[in-house]
Amino acid sequence: MPIRKVLLANPRGFCAGVVRAVEIVERVLKLFPPPIYVYHEIVHNRHVVEDFTKRNVVFVESLEKVPDGAMCVFSAHGVPPQAHQLSKSKGLRVIDATCPLVTKVHLEAIRFTREGYSLVLIGHPGHEEVVGTMGEAPMQLVSSVEEAETLVVPNPEKVVYLTQTTLSLDDTAQIVRALQRRFPKMQAPPTDDVCYATQNRQNAVREIAHKIDLILVIGSGNSSNSQRLREVSTNTGIPAYLVNNETEIMPEWLDGVEVVGITAGASAPEEYVMRVVDHMRSLGATEIEEYAAEEERIHFALPPQLVQLAKSAVSA
């Protein structure tokens, strides 16, 4: 039986932090001569990175590769304090595109350390966001219930946990419960560290799960929030596949499938969602429905240093 219907999860795709980060690079490209350097991928999406690379943006994994005095943008995932110090010593002109919700976690780490807490960070080892947060203060990283159950901290009577912003809500809740059993007096951050966009996209997938036979998650493999969307669907019992675009969809995935769900990670451009929708139409889908689970109206202002650099460029 051919595909009959496509159900689009909404919200999906770009979050406010990604919109802001991409806009920062776009504006820097207009204001300054190439090349423009970006420390780490500006967002974890192959298409976004490839597009900027074609336009003389150079992505680097080490600030040592950035020439002294060059223009450099820090990625949306945040950086440790050492990156700011090295940039200053190299005379770099820096625009920090760190998502404000990641900055919030950094500031929490600094404050709780000053207040004498033992900090526990729930996150994925090696992720740029985790590296940046852990650079702010002494803390211990846990990524599983098993690690939480055996964790030893300097002051078990005064513990607070923080989280990476792009985690699975379900997995995070399980780890938090394990930590609470081990440290009954543990404090939570004032507001949830898992960001609004991560939560909304995961909730939208849960809401459409009973209406679909399979879900396609548009996003890149190194995108934490995209991987979590795939996991959320799988945990509901619905087959889920993570793809960058329509060319990666395997025909055998769609055998016996009538209703296809589609969502996209927070760094995936809508253009590639529509390309997948068009592909589903070519396979027989005649009904395309938007399922709106939550309306998002959040917008983040551009960083003040970008405004100052723009003024300097005009007066030069």
Which residue stretches match the model-derived regions?
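The feature marks the mature, well-folded catalytic cores of soluble enzymes
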Residues: M1-A264, E270-A316
